[in-house]
Amino acid sequence: NNIKVSVLGSDGYTCQIPRIKEGMKLLGHTLSEDSPDLIYSNDPKGYEKALILKEKYPNAYLIFNFLDIPWHIENIERQTELLVKNFFLKADAVSVISSKVQKDMAKFYDKKIHVIYNPIKDVYFDEKIKKNNMFLYVGRANDPVKRIKLVHDSIIKIPEGLKNIKICGSENPGFGNYVGVISDKDLNKLYNSSKFVLLPSKAEGIGLPMIEGMICGTIPVTCSDNLTAREFSPSEFICEPNAQSIVNKIEELDKEYETKREMALKLGEKYKIQFDKKTIAKNIIDIFNSEKN
């Protein structure tokens, strides 16, 4: 059954909305804000507009999705309580992007919380691309939770380390080869040509570079205090959140690189389907169908 869907939230090249919209279209649904059957907001940026649409079209089914609780922010408990009161309690359903966020949100919201994940970029394993780059970092480098300093302090201990890292995203941390925001095609080449993707974040909603890396046969190195890493990544790729531990982990993985890379690729095959934009769109529609009927 094809339905009319409004997809709201942060809508920019580096955001998830463009891919969720593509997923909806691939499933044959129509994107529309004119008497939609389903209103979906991927993050708080779209919540207000979603409520206005819901008031206008009370029969529409409203889903609020939530990305993650940034525990490091002052008054975050209070802010989250207000979010629940002002928004979640007015929704027909609430979803999140990982089991970790589901557990976090359950402290504030006692109704059912669906896990839908969020879509990866259009990346894939390309065996023709040679591994000619050692390290890759993908993400908003200056967000304190991302702990970019750990990347710097680790690779500075590795000969030529600083020369062998490429950093892509909207923020320049001031070291390594910063390439800025790049197309999916170029990002795909970067993942495939790099040996390791470093993601030492303290917390992530998902940590898509870890997933995208494995899909492309790049080993993600993550930290043990990031609970989402433990949800999706093998324990062999996880180390303590300090520079020496990261260096030791890189050296250990590099010694058995081919075997460990196979492990990443194997998981990547599963994640390529699980995190595909069409799958995510279907997960959203499934909530609508199961609750509506």
Please name every model-derived segment.
Residues 38-40, 53-74, 95:
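Active-site proximal beta-strand in glycosyltransferases
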